[in-house]
Amino acid sequence: MPRSLKKGPFVDGHLMKKVDMAVANSDRRVIKTWTRRSTILPEMVGLTFAVHNGKKFMPVFVTENMVGHKLGEFAPTRTYHGHAADKKSKAKK
């Protein structure tokens, strides 16, 4: 169920302060954040965030298509190593 329109999108206060400072100073440095739950707003377009995935910080450059999504959607937390290969079928070939 989506968030109520009267509440508006959720963005952590400390992240919004960093975004406002970066926009005001036209600063293009990477903004390091642990807040994966914050919604991407139109003011964030063009900024680069370093979003923590539980192990390291993943760089996320925000584009117009990302507005309305969460920051955590673009920093995967799980690595896929593929399914285990069947050793018997490889040995016959």
From Swiss-Prot:
InterPro entries from the UniProt entry: Ribosomal_uS19 (IPR002222), Ribosomal_uS19_bac-type (IPR005732), Ribosomal_uS19_CS (IPR020934), Ribosomal_uS19_SF (IPR023575)
One Gene Ontology molecular-function label: structural constituent of ribosome
Any Gene Ontology CC annotation: small ribosomal subunit
UniProt feature coiled coil, ranges: none
Signal peptide: none
Keyword annotations of the record: Ribonucleoprotein, Ribosomal protein, RNA-binding, rRNA-binding
Pfam annotation, one family: Ribosomal_S19
Gene3D superfamilies, alphabetized: 30s Ribosomal Protein S19, Chain A
GO biological process: ribosomal small subunit assembly; translation
Function summary: Protein S19 forms a complex with S13 that binds strongly to the 16S ribosomal RNA.
NCBIfam families from the UniProt entry: rpsS_bact
PANTHER family: RIBOSOMAL PROTEIN S19P FAMILY MEMBER (PTHR11880), SMALL RIBOSOMAL SUBUNIT PROTEIN US19M (PTHR11880:SF8)
Homology family: Belongs to the universal ribosomal protein uS19 family.
Protein name (database record): Small ribosomal subunit protein uS19
Source organism (scientific name): Nitratidesulfovibrio vulgaris (strain ATCC 29579 / DSM 644 / CCUG 34227 / NCIMB 8303 / VKM B-1760 / Hildenborough) (Desulfovibrio vulgaris)
